[in-house]
Amino acid sequence: MRLRKFVLALGFLDACRSGPTPLRLGTTYTVQQSAALAVLESLWTGPPPLATVVAPSGQILRAAANGDLEVVITHAPALEQRLLVAPGHALLRCPLAASRFAVVGPATDPARVATAATAAEAFRRIASAGAPFVSRGDSSGTHVKEVALWRAAGVTPAPRWYLESGTDQAATLHLADERGAYALADLPTYAKLGGLASRILFAADTALTNPYTLYVVRRAEPNPAARVFATWATHAGREAILALRLPDGTPAFVRQPGDCAVSAKP
């Protein structure tokens, strides 16, 4: 509800502003905190300018379904399908880029996560050890992935060792760091923060791939600029995102296969 009020307030400000009406872009905290959003905003020259809303993927997708946003970039494939694609709210679907999730935690690694064979096993070891784990707990793409990993591990997290922060990726990682706890992290965001005592303990599983997809939202009054932005973002914008590097010099993001495709209305 708070997000919708904020987006509606943006609309009021747009109506009071002279010049082109801004394009309403909704995206996630990991896009913002990994520097990918700053890259897009700095290179997009319009017209029109961007009016960007940042929130967890679940909130962004619901706002898009309500018609409050024109373009979204999210990283929760199952939620995207359920909230945007299946009901017919997506006009255009464009694979953008992918990063990687990792299990981070204390250097002592009491749950022996670093020697796990799979991400599910890493989560199972955390539960077996009763080691503290900090979750975002906010219906973000990161939280959705985490829940899927607990399910794959056959584990229901227990309150005595499991804490939901209810906040963004950066704040969650800082909280986990303070408590010597494990957490699921988007690698580019973790790298951008720097200065954390937490270490990357496990990332070697294709289940930890983190795909970002851009959607042009189907609206009663479509904004032609939304398609223009989508084309730009998946070409020049994407190349700039792919140029971002982790501290070890490896790419922070890799290319997502596939081109923009019209999403049929059911």
What does each of the following model-derived ranges do?
Residues 1-7:
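Bacterial N-terminal signal peptides that target proteins for export
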Residues 10-11:
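Processing junctions and N-termini across compartments
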Residues 14-15:
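C-terminal motif of bacterial Sec signal peptides marking the signal peptidase cleavage site
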Residues 18-47, 58, 62-68, 76-77, ...:
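Exported/periplasmic ABC-transporter solute-binding proteins
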Residues 50:
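Hydrophobic anchor at the start of a short beta-strand
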Residues 70-71, 91-103:
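Short, glycine-/small- and polar/acidic-enriched structural segments
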Residues 84-92:
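Hydrophobic/aromatic-rich structural module bridging two neighboring secondary-structure elements via a short loop
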